[in-house]
Structure formats: C-alpha cells, structure tokens
Amino acid sequence: MIIPVRCFTCGKVIGNKWDAYLDLLQLDYTEGDALDALNLVRYCCRRMLMTHVDLIEKLLNYNTLEKSDNS
C-alpha cells in the first residue's frame, strides 16, 4: 500500500525516505548500505522500509465503481 509516515514502534518519520531508498537501490546499493546512507540505524525503522510492499499502483487498476457486464 502506501508507506507509513512514521515508524510503528518508535514514531520516527520515515515516509519521506521511501523515494530516496528506492533511488539508492537503483544505484546498486545493498539494502543495508542504502539504509545506512539514509541514517536509519534503529532496526524498527529499517524493517519498515525493508518489508514494505508497494501495491498502490496495482490497486489503482481496479475501479470498484464500475458495474460488471455479468450482473
């Protein structure tokens, strides 16, 4: 879905780091090196970025307001 704005455990703002994290991964940084470059040292904040699954683009393909032809 959408990256949470704050870490669930400690409350640190992490939502603004998602795009930078993806950019660093595109530059062939490892996950750990990218998180270190973003100054995310707490393991709770690190897991928020590492385990996030970005599904928003896939969900936007489904329009729940459209009626199907089968009804």
Curated annotation (Swiss-Prot):
Binding site for Zn(2+): C7, C10, C44, C45
The entry's keywords: DNA-directed RNA polymerase, Metal-binding, Nucleus, Transcription, Zinc
InterPro entries found in the cross-reference section: RNA_pol_su_RPB10, RNA_pol_suN_Zn-BS, RPABC5/Rpb10
A molecular function (GO) term: DNA-directed RNA polymerase activity
Chief subcellular location: nucleus
Localization: Nucleus
Superkingdom: Eukaryota
Assembly: Component of the RNA polymerase I (Pol I), RNA polymerase II (Pol II) and RNA polymerase III (Pol III) complexes consisting of at least 13, 12 and 17 subunits, respectively.
NCBIfam families per record: PRK04016.1 (NF003089)
Similarity remark: Belongs to the archaeal Rpo10/eukaryotic RPB10 RNA polymerase subunit family.
Listed name of the protein: DNA-directed RNA polymerases I, II, and III subunit RPABC5
